């Protein structure tokens, strides 16, 4: 995986659960995954959890990538790698950590035999859209999801 002065990207392991939970909560404040769910996810063969850590092995950011066999908006092949989420602690942004996480996700996705890596961002999150563009992602579709309450 990637190594730079002061930090490196590596695969997350069971001992990283608490650090990964804290980073996930920073990205997804409403997430309710617990330790058991995350440990089970770390053991899945069709998903990868990546951490970027400093020289003292303190987690600075993460990426979660999976293989999806269902239709993924804007893609032309199956299966497709999907960057479920990626996050770098604010104090470490602008130093290439996000790009390194995406590069590691690309490498893992290729190893799974996928021809495409997809991701998503909220329509109102211009920062996430800019980060995706900076890493080479191209926008494909913009959708609005609806629901009808039945009960």
Please tell me what each predicted stretch does.
Residues 88, 94-107, 130-134:
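Conserved acetyl-CoA-binding loop-helix of GNAT-fold acetyltransferases
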Residues 109-121:
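Conserved GNAT acetyl-CoA-binding A-motif
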Residues 17, 21-35, 71:
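Helix-loop element at the rim of GNAT/NAT acetyltransferase active sites that forms part
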Residues 70-83, 93, 141:
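A conserved beta-turn-beta hairpin within the catalytic core of GNAT-like acetyltransferases
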Residues 58-67, 82, 87:
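Conserved beta-strand in the GNAT
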Residues 7-20:
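A short beta-loop-alpha structural element at the N-terminal edge
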Residues 31-51, 64, 70:
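Active-site rim helix/loop that mediates acceptor-substrate recognition in acyltransferases
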Residues 99, 111, 123-142:
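Conserved active-site alpha-helix within GNAT-family acetyltransferase domains
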């Amino acid at each position: 995986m990637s190594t730079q002065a002061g930090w490196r990207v590596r695969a997350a392991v069971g001992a990283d659960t608490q650090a990964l939970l804290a980073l996930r909560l920073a990205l997804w404040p409403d997430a309710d995954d617990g330790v058991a769910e995350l440990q089970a996810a770390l053991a899945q063969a069709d998903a990868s959890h990546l951490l970027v850590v400093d020289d003292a092995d303190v987690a600075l950011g993460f990426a979660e990538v999976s293989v999806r066999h269902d239709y993924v908006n804007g893609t032309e092949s199956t299966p497709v790698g999907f960057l479920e989420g990626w996050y770098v602690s604010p104090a470490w942004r602008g130093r290439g950590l996000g790009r390194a996480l995406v590069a590691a996700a690309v490498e893992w996705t290729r190893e799974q035999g996928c021809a495409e890596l997809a991701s998503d961002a909220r329509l109102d999150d211009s920062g996430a859209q800019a980060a995706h563009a900076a890493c080479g992602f191209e926008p494909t579709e913009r959708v609005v999801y609806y629901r009808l309450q039945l009960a």
